Every structure is written in structure tokens, then in C-alpha cells.
A protein has these predicted regions:
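GHKL (Bergerat-fold) ATPase N-terminal catalytic module, capturing the glycine-rich phosphate-binding loop
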Residues: 1-185, 192, 199, 215-222, ...
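GHKL/Bergerat-fold ATPase module in large chromosome/replication-associated machines
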Residues: 117, 135-158, 178-181, 188-691
Length: 691
């Protein structure tokens, strides 16, 4: 062919500067785009062979070579795919690819991040000009009678096309890097980028430093491959040593057999895994393979708890693996990573428009070739097809958890402490997920037993009730007979604790009366139980110290009206707190002197404000929502009796303060000032005992 000069477009003067500036932070995607093009060319050539339109050599193996040359400031990306004719170069490179890149830039250059294309996928061949001042293409088509073509463009409006000198079918793209992007010709940087985007592409990718000295390795002669380049044959005779046998005679014993080896040019090792685990059927994968894949992809050497293998062909093609990572403590980061792929090409991490937000706490890979990638993020949010994908993933996660709870409750309970933040967050974020999983949420109780909400709310069989519970049930029945028949039934109460150590006194009281409470000690629990109450009107949650249940009281005692009045005056004066509510009750446990209860609503609001403040969200002062406090004194306790009988004693104010602080300690830590006074007062009380 004769040399040809052409113009890309009369409007192209601004294209390349825009590409370089607009995608400044994502320059490395050119590797993904160009290697993907090469991978597509190889896939198409294989399809032509399968269709009988072309005959590949028997030893054909598709591969992509990346050659970096820091001295020459060049990168070469070579594939042995179907190649192009001069007309095809003219059509696809100078027109279609350029037009596509132009449309791509014009459409999205002024958009906000929410309107950008995910992963900037689709810029294609012209992504090369993000890093190069000049790009050349050498190509030879598979079509019979084709001649090699050389195309070049220096980033301006013109290109040049002429006869090339390529001998093998395929395409070689050479990038002449600009001075700002020389890092990409560094072998280690190139490896990093290729492994980031191309670790699982379906065609083997090889990286080498151009003109680097050859490296060698030694192999057994029997392991020689047809593709090996032999440098030297090495024969090593057997080695013998003189040893004494069982008869005490000396003889020559072979200690190393003869070896026939070959010194060969070091075999290249592909950077990628062409058949990642998610492309296989779940029944073909072993537990160890799942764990190894997890370690390799996420560099996390703590074993995952379990995983979900997604494998769907209809109505859309979606494959992937989602892992539930182990979280050691509440303070561990539970931010996960979901990697999105398209035909084994990495697009981006944590695309919330495609993957439900609560799944971002997991780690995993999702490959969906049907996903529309040439649209903006905002368009994806309203895409019905994408919504179906999101719903499918959510359903599979819920099905896995429900199935485990039904068929392997022991394992489900073992994993629960790690997976509960994820499930509760999912319930807060996804109503359908919550509806599906609601009856399979576990609650650990104060007896270290795991129960679902239906199990907690189920009535206790008569033969399982304690004497105290039976008596309370009888009392409740009598009270019910005297109530208005039209009155709405009271909600079932689920009692809970947030700190088993601090609230130990209340737990002891509950256990003594055969009562139960669940443990809710994660910072997500306040929001979670609030949502459960909003969605269900037949039960409520109440912290164990929010009120004294009738089961803890002894109703047979004397009237306490006068005692309440007297002790209320004593404690309000001693504590200098006229707003404090003081009650006197006959508690069944005489060892308990005082109990402080805080209103559930006020304390829960305080917890929410603290959580927002801890998250850097600002907001109102938690003290604005101080929970109403009630100090309950036990009339059956000897110390309370002493205070009642000796209200004018000089030591009573000190005892009153001490009882209040002891009750407070079962609810929350004392402030620095309160603790200082508490310690001094404790010492003073002990001194009294010495006199």
C-alpha cells in the first residue's frame, strides 16, 4: 500500500489534552484498556477457528506480551489475535475508536463523580494517549493475502499509515511515553498495575523488560517441553559412598542417582490466572481452594468464616464469590471490599450502584458480563436490570444464612458474633433483606444460649416455669380479669443488657427469679432494635435497668408510703438533687440495697447521640437527652433499714451518697470527679469501722 496521511477529526485538537487532564488520577487504566483489546482479538480468532472460518495451528496458544523499556521510554503490548487489515485500521482505529473516545469525553468530561462511568470503562485504544506523546500500531490480519500495516499518531489531528514489516498474525501497539508517565515503563510498576486490572483475564499475560539479559533455569530432561530453548545438556553421574553393611563389611552404596538435566532459557510465568475460582462450578471447588483464593485476592491471612458461590446464567449472567470475614473485636474495621469484574476484567471496587450497600461489609468478587458499563453511575441507580442484579445477590445471601440456620444451627451460632453486625446493618439498609432474615436473627442471652426472636417470644411451657414465674403468671391473670376487655394487650417485653459486667447486679436479680435477658453490646444494636420495634407492634425492647419488673418485687410486704416519703427526703437532701425520683420497694433479694433505673427512651436517645458524636457527625449534646433516673431502695435491706431508722444520724448523708454511687456503677461509669469522691468516701466508711 502507498503511504497515507489522514485527519482524525476537525474537532480533535482538544481531545488528547482532555484525556490527559480529565483522567489524571486514573492514568493506569490504559493498561487495562489495551490488554483487554488484545484479549478480545484472541477470543475472536478462536471463535473463527471454532466456526471453521479460520484454521489455527495445532500448537496455537493465545497470549499477550507486555514489553517495557525504561531506557527507550516505551511500552509494547503485543497479542497474537486476529490482527487488522489497512481498511480495518482505517475503520476501527481512525474512525470508530476515535469517534467512541470523542463521544466518551464529550459526554462525561464535565460531569460530577456521581455521573462518571464506573472505572472509566470504555475509553478503549485512545486511553494510550493519557501517557504517551506518540502511539504506533503494527498489525497483520489473519485474512488470506493480508499485508502488514503500520499506523502512527503523535497526539495531534493527523495520523500516518503505511506498509509494515510484521511477520506474524496479531497486533503490536507501541507507546512512546511522555516524561510525566515514565513510571509505567518500570517493570515493577507495570506488574503492579497489570495485576490490579488483569489478574483474571482469560488470556495469559506475560511481562518482560525489553532487551534484558536472558535468565536460565535447570530442569530434569524428562520435563522438557517443545517450547523450551535448550542452552546446555548436563549429565551428572551417580554418587557413591563407602558404608558398612549388616555383616560389618564395607561396600559402595549409591547416595545420589545419575541425573540428566537441561539448562534452558527461563520459562516465562503468566501474571494472571485465566480460570479464576468463580468461573468454576461450586461442586468443582474445594474448601482449601476457596481459602487460598481469599488469601490471594484480599491479602488477608485470617481464614474467612464461610462463603457464598454465586453462579447464575439466566435471566442474566452473574458469577462470583462472597466471603464473610472474621472480625476479632468490635473495634476491628468491618469495611469490606467487593471487586466488580466484567468478563474477568477488573472494573472497580465497591460500586454501590450495583452492589447493595450492606454487602460492602463483606469481601468478594462479582463478575457480570451483562452489566451496562458505558453508562454513568447515576444512570445505574435507576436501571431496572441493575436493580434485579442487586436483588438477586441480596436473596442469595439471605438464602445462605437461612439455610445454615435451618440445617447447621451449631455452625450458625458459632459464626453469629462475627456476622451479626453485617446482618443487622443489612436489616437497617434493606427492607426486603430484613423481611427475609428477620426470624433467623439470633440473640445471645445471659445464659449463653442463642435464640431467635420467635423463640424468645414463645410462651414458656407450664412444666418449664419456675415457681416465681408461675406465681407471677397467676397474679397477672388476676389483674387481667379486672382490666377493661377492650384495652389493647400489652406488648411483649424483651429485656436486654449492654454490658454484662457493669449490669451484673441486674443480671443476678433476673437469674434468681428465672428471668432472661439478651445481650446487645454492639454499637449498631440501638439502631437495630429501634427499627425492629417500628416494624413490629407486638413486642418492645427494654434494657434490664430501665425498670424493675414485678417479678423482682415481694408484694407481701408492709405498706411503704411513709418509708418512701422519709427516704426520698433524706436522699434528695444528701445528693442535693430535688429532681431525683426515689422509690422504696420490697425486693426479693435482701442483699441488694439500691437499684438505679433509667428510662429506656431517654437512655436510648443518649446512646444515639454518643454514636453520632463518635462517628464525627456532630449533632446535639447527649446531656440534652439525660435519661430520667429513679433510685429504688430495698426495704428488705439492712442498710436501708438503718438509714430509715436513723435518718438524723451524721453518717446517713454519707451512706446515702454511697448507695447512690453503688447503684450508678451498675448503670454506667462514674465521672472522674464522682469516682474521686467515691474512693474517698469508701475510705471514710472503712475508717468508721475501725472506731
Amino acid at each position: 500500500m502507498t503511504e497515507k496521511h489522514g485527519n482524525l477529526s476537525i474537532d480533535s485538537d482538544n481531545l488528547f489534552p482532555i484525556i490527559k487532564k480529565w483522567l489524571y488520577s486514573d492514568h493506569d487504566i490504559f493498561y487495562r484498556e489495551l490488554i483487554s483489546n488484545g484479549c478480545d482479538a484472541i477470543t475472536k480468532l478462536k471463535k473463527l477457528d471454532m466456526m471453521g472460518e479460520y484454521s489455527l495451528p495445532a500448537d496455537y496458544k493465545g497470549k499477550i506480551q507486555v514489553l517495557v523499556n525504561p531506557d527507550e521510554k516505551t511500552i509494547k503490548i503485543i497479542d497474537n489475535g486476529l490482527g487488522m487489515t489497512a481498511d480495518e485500521v482505517e475503520e476501527y482505529i481512525s474512525r470508530i475508536a476515535f469517534s467512541g473516545a470523542t463521544d466518551f469525553i464529550e459526554k462525561y468530561k464535565d460531569k460530577s463523580n456521581d455521573d462518571q462511568i464506573i472505572g472509566h470503562f470504555g475509553l478503549g485504544f485512545y486511553s494510550a494517549f493519557m501517557v504517551a506523546d506518540e502511539v504506533t500500531i503494527d498489525t497483520l490480519s489473519y485474512k488470506e493475502g493480508s499485508t502488514p500495516v503500520h499506523w502512527s499518531c503523535d497526539g495531534g489531528t493527523e495520523y500516518n499509515m503505511e506498509d509494515g514489516d510484521m511477520d506474524d498474525v496479531g497486533t503490536e501497539i507501541t507507546l512512546y511515553l511522555n516524561d510525566d508517565c515514565l513510571e509505567f515503563a518500570n517493570e515493577y510498576r507495570a506488574r503492579e498495575v497489570i495485576e490490579k486490572y488483569c489478574s483474571f483475564m482469560p488470556t495469559e499475560i506475560y511481562l518482560a523488560k525489553e532487551n534484558a539479559p536472558e535468565e536460565y533455569e535447570t530442569i530434569d530432561k524428562a520435563d522438557k517441553r517443545d517450547t523450551d530453548t535448550v542452552i546446555e545438556e548436563i549429565h551428572e553421574d551417580a554418587k557413591y559412598e563407602e558404608k558398612e553393611n549388616d555383616k560389618g563389611e564395607k561396600e559402595q552404596v549409591e547416595v545420589s542417582p545419575a541425573k540428566d538435566q537441561l539448562k534452558i532459557v527461563k520459562r516465562p510465568v503468566p501474571l494472571n490466572d485465566t480460570t479464576p475460582l468463580w468461573t468454576k462450578s461450586p461442586n468443582e471447588c474445594t474448601d482449601e481452594e476457596y481459602k487460598e483464593f481469599y488469601r490471594k485476592v484480599f491479602l488477608d491471612y485470617k481464614e474467612p468464616l464461610f462463603w457464598i458461590h454465586l453462579n447464575m446464567d439466566y435471566p442474566f449472567n452473574l458469577k462470583g464469590i462472597l466471603y464473610f470475614p472474621k472480625i476479632n473485636t468490635e473495634y476491628d474495621s468491618i469495611e469490606g471490599t467487593i471487586k466488580l469484574y466484567n468478563n474477568q476484567v477488573f472494573i472497580a471496587d465497591n460500586i454501590k450502584e450495583v452492589i447493595p450497600e450492606f454487602l460492602m461489609l463483606l469481601k468478594g468478587v462479582i463478575d457480570c458480563p451483562d452489566l451496562p458499563l458505558n453508562v454513568s453511575r447515576s444512570a445505574l441507580q435507576n436501571d431496572g436490570f441493575v436493580k434485579k442484579i442487586s436483588e438477586y445477590i441480596t436473596k442469595k445471601v439471605a438464602d445462605k444464612l437461612i439455610g445454615m440456620c435451618k440445617t447447621d444451627k451449631e455452625a450458625y451460632e458459632k459464626y453469629w458474633d462475627d456476622i451479626s453486625p453485617f446482618i443487622k446493618f443489612g436489616c437497617l439498609k434493606d427492607e426486603k433483606f430484613c423481611d427475609k432474615i428477620n426470624d433467623y436473627i439470633l440473640f445471645k442471652d445471659i445464659n449463653d444460649k442463642y435464640q431467635t426472636l420467635p423463640e424468645l417470644l414463645a410462651p414458656v411451657a407450664e412444666d418449664e416455669k419456675t415457681d416465681a414465674e408461675s406465681a407471677d403468671a397467676s397474679d397477672d391473670a388476676k389483674k387481667a380479669d379486672n382490666t377493661d376487655e377492650n384495652k389493647e394487650p400489652e406488648k411483649n417485653t424483651v429485656y436486654y443488657v449492654t454490658d454484662v459486667v457493669q449490669q451484673g447486679q441486674y443480671i443476678k436479680l433476673f437469674k434468681e427469679q428465672g428471668m432472661n435477658a439478651v445481650i446487645l453490646d454492639h454499637n449498631i444494636d440501638t439502631s437495630f432494635i429501634t427499627q425492629l420495634e417500628q416494624r413490629n407492634d407486638h413486642y418492645k425492647f427494654m434494657r434490664i435497668d430501665a425498670d424493675l419488673t414485678e417479678s423482682l418485687k415481694d408484694e407481701s410486704g408492709a405498706d411503704l408510703t411513709e418509708a418512701t416519703s422519709t427516704l426520698s427526703e433524706v436522699f434528695k437532701k444528701a445528693l442535693n438533687n430535688d429532681k431525683l425520683t426515689v422509690k422504696v420497694e420490697n425486693l426479693k433479694n435482701a442483699d441488694v440495697a439500691s437499684v438505679l433505673t433509667l428510662s429506656e427512651q431517654g437512655r436510648r436517645m443518649q446512646d444515639m447521640m454518643k454514636m453520632y458524636a463518635a462517628g464525627g457527625m456532630g449533632g446535639m449534646d447527649p446531656s440534652m437527652f439525660a435519661a430520667d433516673q429513679t433510685l429504688t431502695l430495698n426495704a428488705n435491706n439492712e442498710l436501708v433499714k438503718y438509714i430509715l431508722d436513723n435518718k438524723d444520724s451524721e453518717h446517713v448523708p454519707m451512706f446515702a451518697e454511697q448507695l447512690y454511687d453503688l447503684a450508678m456503677l451498675s448503670n454506667q461509669p462514674l465521672s472522674v470527679d464522682q469516682m474521686t469522691k467515691f474512693v474517698k468516701r469508701s475510705n471514710d466508711i472503712m475508717l468508721l469501722l475501725t472506731k
